[in-house]
Structures are given as C-alpha cells and as structure tokens.
Amino acid sequence: MLHGRLRDILRLLMAAEAPVTSSFFAAQLNVTTRTVRNDIKELQGVLSGHGAFVQSVRGSGYKLRIDDEQVFRTLLQDEFQQKKGLPVLPEERMAYLMKRLLLADHYLKLDELAEELFISKSTLQTDLKEVKKRLLPYRIVMETRPNYGFKLRGDEVQMRYCMAEYIVDERETEIDVLNEKADILPKEEIEIIRSAILKKMKNDRIPLSNMGLNNLIIHIAIACKRIRTENYVSLFPKDMDHILHQKEYQAAEAIVKELESKLSVTFPKDETAYITMHLLGTKRMTQSQCGEDTFSIEEETDQLTLAMIKAVDRELKLGILHDKELKIGLALHMKPAISRNRYGMNLRNPMLAAIKEHYPLAFEAGIIAGIVIKEQTGIEIHENEIGYLALHFGAAIERKKTESPPKRCIIVCASGAGSAQLLREKLRSHFGKRLDILGTAEYYSLDQMSYESIDFVISTIPIKKELPVPVLKVNTILGGTDFTKIESILSDEKEKANRYLKKELVFFQEDLRSKEEVIQFLGQKVVECGFADEEIIDSIFEREDMSPTCFGNLVAIPHPLVPQTKTTFWAVCTLKKPIDWESQRVQFVCLLCVEKENKADLQSMYKLLGSILDDPAAMNQLIKCRSYQELSDVFDQKMLS
C-alpha cells in the first residue's frame, strides 16, 4: 500500500515532536515540495480508516495524529514487515542495482533494466554513475560490450567482499531472514552451511559471536555460489604460506569436507584457504560470554589496546582508563581485526549508521583508537571496524555513568508535611540511589541555607530568589515532564548552546554546492577570526576521509582529526539547498572545534548535538533560522523539552 517514499514520510512524521514543513521533507527525500504535497495527500488516503491522519498545521507544517493506536499499529506491521517491491527512492535503486549487477552471470542491457525499474534511460544512467563510485573501492569495473550490454569485472576476492557488503541488506543480522532477502543459496543449503560451522566450532571449542557466525555463513554461501559458476579465488603464495600454518586451516578443511559431501561443490585448496581467512577474521565472544579460561591476550595486542584506551581518555576525558572490561573486550576484538586487514577483508557492520547517529561520542572514540592502530601497526582501519570499536567505548561510557555519585537535593513544598513526604517517597521510588534527598525546606529559609553540599532544589512553588544552584519547578503530584526535568540534571544533560556558539561563526542560507565548499568556507572563517591556523582545513578533510561526518536528518558535524584550537566552539552554517555529503543529504553543518589539550568532559556537549540529530522537527526549525538568537533558542528549547 505504501511505496518507498510514503514509508519515509510516515517514518519522519512518527519521529517528529513538532509539525514538519514540506520543504524539510523535500530536502530529506530529494524531491520538490509539490511532490511532497501530493505524497502526503496519497498518504492521507492510506491512513484513512487505519486509526491515524496527517494534520496540516497552518504556518508550521504537518503533524501525525493517531486516533486508534491498535488499528494504526496493525497498519504499521502490515506495511513495514512485508517484503519490499520495486525501489522508488534513489538510494533504494542504488541497493537494487548493486544486487542485480553482482548476482548477474550474464550481460545486462540498459533498455531492459530501465524497463524493469520503470524509470527512464537517463535516470538509469545517472544511477549507474553512482554504482560505479561504489564499486571503485573494490577495484570492480563495469565492462561494456556492443550489442550485449554490460557486466561487472574484477578480482574474485574483491568481488566476493563487495557481494557480502551489498547483496545482504546491511540492516539484517539474523541469518534466517538473510536468505529470502539476498537470494544467495536455497534456505536448505544455508542451513547445511550453518550446521557444518557450528559442528566444528563446538568440537574445537572455538567461541564465536552470533554476528561472527552470520558473517561466516554469508561468505561461505557466496563462495559456494561463485564456485558453481566457475569463479574461483587465487591467493598470493605469501598469503597461502601464512594461512596453511594457522590452526584455523584445519577447521576450514573439516567444514569444507562436510560441505563437499552435502552440497556437491568441490573446493580447491585456495578456496579452503579463503574460508580460513574468514575464520581468522571472525568476531569471537567476549570474556563475559565465554568464561575466563577460554581466551588469552598476546603482549603486543595488550600494549596496543592500552595505548588506544589512553589516547581516547586523554582526548575525550571519559574517565575509562581503568575499565578492565573495556581492555579485555578491545583486546579480544583486535586479533581478528588485524587478520581482516591482512587479507583486505571488510567486516559488515549493520549497526554503523545507528552508532554514528545515536552514539557520536563513542564513534569519535573509535576514530581516535583507529589513529593509534595506524600509528603503531601501519594498519588503516575501515569505517565498519571503527563502528565496532565504538561499541566497546560506548559500553564503557555507560558503565562510567553508573559509577557517578548521587546528586543531592532539597525539596521546597508549600502544601504541608504530607505533600512533601509523598513527593520525597515518589522521587526515591523513581530515581533510587541516583538521587540523595537531604531534606525539606520552607521558602522563607532559603536565604539562610548553605548550598555547599546541595546540587539543586526541587520546588512545587515558583522561587523568584537568586539561588547558587539550579531550581526545578515540579507539580506536587509528579508527572512525566517533571521526571524528565530531574533526569536532565541527574544525567548532566543541561547544556547551553551559547557556550559553544560564536556570533561571528554562525551563517545562514549560504549558497554552497558541495561538501568541499562547505568545509573550505567554515574552515576559512575560523582561520580569519584567529581561532586556528590554516592547517585546520587539511585536518578536517583528513578526518572526513576516515569516515564521513554526515548523520542523516540533514546534519553533518565535520571536525579536525586532532584538536587544533585554543577553545572548544562550533561554527554553524545552514544552506539554501541540501547538498550531497557522501551518501546523505545535508543542509545543516556544525563544524566542531575542540580545544587543544582539552581537560573538560565533553559528554554533555555531545548529548546536546545528539539530541538534535534525533529530532527532525528541531532540525527543521534550525534550517529555518535567520538569526543567531533564533538558533540559540532552538537549541535551548530542545534541552528543556
């Protein structure tokens, strides 16, 4: 019932807390506002009778209203769980074309492919230019033959890596849904591969993570498919010699023996070595998953891990230097990671986009760790690998939060002792040990109190006096918004944007057409204002080369690879029209500059930025801003909401 673009509009409406304009939808979807209005009219027809409707709010935009949650939920289940048909959005077509070309064992004709997708030849040719860009890192080319059409050519190992990345939907992590989406092998054969791997892993007591197992199944399934069409890998003698001396080679031989008998596929020696490469590069379980006695860490890996943690803690001030679980988790991750790099393997990371969007601080920690790895080993870490490193650092950040001492407060309540007692018990019940309530106080006594041991005041009445600590006004009978206000204090989320914004470095509706133009523009403005040297621009591009800083929701947050400035601040720019920033559309750019030798905890700043990344309505407001004060107010309102 809903084609791809309608699904995306519905997703954006569901995520927005405030009305969203047609221009915001147009920028996100790369269509005109007229197309958006037509789409919303079509969406309205679908939602009619399904418990929801799109409300047009005069002067503000569109908002989703839900009348019957149960009926609406049924619609969502029907729409989002059914198998997708033909692609509609450009990004959907990219994914379709990549799969189509990679799986084709014959030449494809332009006319036939355009007809298959219900698009014009010119649109298809534009799409194929983007396909060629995506094939470039794998050194795969599109070979054209007159009267026949075109097909892909490249090194077999790289072809298989590309297939693993693009044939299987990167969001799918469970192997039982991989087969129906990817069409690599029949389901029964996938099960045979899974059983052969698990049998050997169990016999040899090799601990394997669920994601590691799934990646291994994918690569072996692709190998089977390619061998059947007589496409074989050929490894360098140096690599073969190294692989043959690994204990994993024997495990690969056992798996191959079972597959040959059950799948009627013959694996040459190089193909067995290819499976060994993936066994060497497979993610293993962590210490907590497989027990103390099932792993050992080499001295070299131990030292590298410690250097990574020290660098991250020095740059970001996370207080994670003595986190034993982090050290063990990273060390266990590094050995297969180094093997993956040795053989040019690119581990799929279905969580990468979510990690970058929701855990920007942890991802930055992964970037810093990647720099250390390159400095000490010469290994260039891929973006997917950085995402996995970020997970380890993100877990350490969360563990650190639980170690924080409780916040201390007093209660001011004008309704009497009974109300104060109810309020106190409700707070204790909700926040537990995170909140230490020192007692209650009368309004008139606030001037005589010492606030040295008090972090904030909770009051059921307005307090007009200036107090040296924050005051939170709540209802006597606590509600959801009251808890949210208190949570923001307990989580140290109360951060003001004007602490980082500088009027001379905020620009609106700039007519810039590319990522390079935007970075050059903002970097040059920072230099002209005397906040950094010219080197900052090169450093920003270096960081961008490691991993694009676009996060979806029309946002990009570029920054130097290493801190370059005397203070921590933002340079902000909105654009007249969205631009392509790698794989995302971007219209709001925040150049993040962190102080050299920074000693401050930046977690609250990253939370402030993260709150904007997650909110389409807030981003819509920021893009419409025309003054510094408007921009600052949107940020502050977001933190209060």
Swiss-Prot record:
The lineage of its organism: Bacteria, Bacillati, Bacillota, Bacilli, Bacillales. Changing residue 392 to E: Loss of activity. The regulatory activity of LicR is modulated by phosphorylation and dephosphorylation of the various LicR domains. It becomes activated via phosphoryl group transfer from PEP, EI and HPr on the two conserved histidine residues in the PRD 2 domain, whereas phosphorylation of the EIIA-like domain on His-559 by the PTS EIIB component LicB inactivates LicR. It is an enzyme of class 2 (transferase). One of its GO terms (biological process) is phosphoenolpyruvate-dependent sugar phosphotransferase system. The modification Phosphohistidine is found at residues 219, 278, 333, 392, 559. Residues 184-289, 296-403 form the PRD domain. Positive regulator of the licABCH operon. Residues 499-638 form the PTS EIIA type-2 domain. Belongs to the transcriptional antiterminator BglG family. The modification Phosphocysteine is found at residue 413. This is Probable licABCH operon regulator. Keywords: Activator, Kinase, Phosphoprotein, Repeat, RNA-binding, Transcription, Transcription regulation, Transferase. It comes from Bacillus subtilis (strain 168). PANTHER family: CRYPTIC BETA-GLUCOSIDE BGL OPERON ANTITERMINATOR, LICABCH OPERON REGULATOR-RELATED. One of its GO terms (molecular function) is kinase activity.
